[in-house]
Amino acid sequence: MAYLKIVLVALMLVLAVSAMRRPDQQDQDISVAKRVACKCDDDGPDVRSATFTGTVDLGSCNSGWEKCASYYTVIADCCRKPRG
């Protein structure tokens, strides 16, 4: 019976600690930008040796960025900041 009490207390402590998150930690989790690299048309023909200079943006490119891939997808575009 003592073993069961120890296990229950330990589980309650784990639950309490995991439930106590500071509000600023929750905000940081949401605002983290997740970027994925993509290959622009002028990066080269071979995917293995090309440097990926583009960034995948969901929907369409952000303001001030240009679409750098000729292929079309409904969900995302391959974009980068204009050169020059």
From Swiss-Prot:
Q: According to the UniProt entry, where is the signal peptide?
A: 1-19
Propeptide cleavage-removed residue intervals: 20-33
Origin species: Cryptodendrum adhaesivum (Adhesive sea anemone)
* Keyword annotations of the record: Cleavage on pair of basic residues, Disulfide bond, Ion channel impairing toxin, Nematocyst, Neurotoxin, Secreted, Signal, Toxin, Voltage-gated sodium channel impairing toxin
An example Gene Ontology cellular component term from the record? extracellular region
Report the sequence similarity comment from the record: Belongs to the sea anemone sodium channel inhibitory toxin family. Type II subfamily.
Name of the protein in its database record: Delta-thalatoxin-Cad1a
Q: Which domain of life is it from?
A: Eukaryota
The taxonomic lineage of its organism, from the top, reads: Eukaryota, Metazoa, Cnidaria, Anthozoa, Hexacorallia
GO MF annotation, one:
toxin activity
**Mainly localized where?**
secreted
Enumerate the transmembrane spans: none
Cystine pairs annotated here are: C38-C78, C40-C68, C61-C79
